[in-house]
C-alpha cells in the first residue's frame, strides 16, 4: 500500500484524488495539507506541510507554485519522493526543481491525463512534417477559477511542437492590432469560463484543409487517476526527474 501525503487536498483536484483513491487497494491518502482544512476527508489534514507528523511514502502536490520551497524542504528532510502536478512555475522555480532532482526523486508533469500525453507524443511525430505547409494555432479552455494562463498543458504542447521544428518559433499570446500572421508564429489563446475541466485544440491550417488534434477532459478523474498512477510508479525509483512518459513506458 502506497501512503500518499496530498498537498492541496482541499482544492478541486485534491477532492477528486481523495474520492478516487477510495477505489484503490494499493494506494491511499494518509494525510493532507490545506490552509483551510475540511473535516470530512477521512484522513488528518494539516495547515502546512511542516506540521505533518504522519508516516507517508510519497508527496503528491496539487497546490500553488509558492508552496514549492516548503515541499522541497520537507521532501529532503523526510527523504520522500515528490509528484509535482502544480502548474505556473517560474523559470527560476523550474531550474530549482531540476537541480533538486539530481539528488532526489522527483516526478513533474504539466498534465496527468494519459490522453494528453499521447497527444503530446503524436505532436512529436507530426509537427515537423506539417510545419512546412500549415499554420499552427493552439486554443485552450478552462474553468473560471484557473489562475495561470496559458495553461501548463498548452505550454507543454507548444514546446513539443517548437522543439520538433528546426526553425526559430515565436509564441504569440492572443492576437490584437493590425498585422498578418507570420509562418513561424504559434498563436496560443486562452479561454476561461464556467466549469470547463480542460480542452486543448491544436490547429494545423493549410491551403484547402485543416487538421485538428484535440483533447477534452470530461472529468477531473482522468487527472486524478494519472496522479495516483505516478505516485505508485515513483515510490521505488532513485534520484532523477521523471514524467508521464516514464509512467506510461512511452
Swiss-Prot record:
The active site is at residues 142, 146. NAD(+) binds at residues 8-13, 34, 85-87, 109-112. Keywords: Amino-acid biosynthesis, Cytoplasm, Diaminopimelate biosynthesis, Lysine biosynthesis, NAD, NADP, Oxidoreductase. It catalyses: (S)-2,3,4,5-tetrahydrodipicolinate + NAD(+) + H2O = (2S,4S)-4-hydroxy-2,3,4,5-tetrahydrodipicolinate + NADH + H(+); (S)-2,3,4,5-tetrahydrodipicolinate + NADP(+) + H2O = (2S,4S)-4-hydroxy-2,3,4,5-tetrahydrodipicolinate + NADPH + H(+). It comes from the Bacteria. It is found in: Cytoplasm. One of its GO terms (molecular function) is 4-hydroxy-tetrahydrodipicolinate reductase. NADP(+) binds at residue 35. InterPro entries: DapB_C, DapB_N, DapB_N_CS, DHDPR_bac, NAD(P)-bd_dom_sf. GO terms for cellular component: cytosol. Its main location: cytoplasm. Its EC number is 1.17.1.8. One of its GO terms (biological process) is diaminopimelate biosynthetic process. (S)-2,3,4,5-tetrahydrodipicolinate binds at residues 143, 152-153. Pathway: Amino-acid biosynthesis; L-lysine biosynthesis via DAP pathway; (S)-tetrahydrodipicolinate from L-aspartate: step 4/4. CDD domains: DHDPR_N. Catalyzes the conversion of 4-hydroxy-tetrahydrodipicolinate (HTPA) to tetrahydrodipicolinate. NCBIfam families: dapB. Belongs to the DapB family. This is 4-hydroxy-tetrahydrodipicolinate reductase. It comes from Clostridium acetobutylicum (strain ATCC 824 / DSM 792 / JCM 1419 / IAM 19013 / LMG 5710 / NBRC 13948 / NRRL B-527 / VKM B-1787 / 2291 / W).
